[in-house]
Amino acid sequence: MNSNLTALRTVQASRPFLSNKKRMALFVQEKLA
């Protein structure tokens, strides 16, 4: 149970990080374009 909870927490914590990286990538592409 503990390992499953920690796995869910890590996944939930990584989601906004990935979305932020995508947003930054799009922002940089728009700046360079």
Swiss-Prot record:
Partially overlaps HAC1. This is Putative uncharacterized protein YFL031C-A. It comes from Saccharomyces cerevisiae (strain ATCC 204508 / S288c).
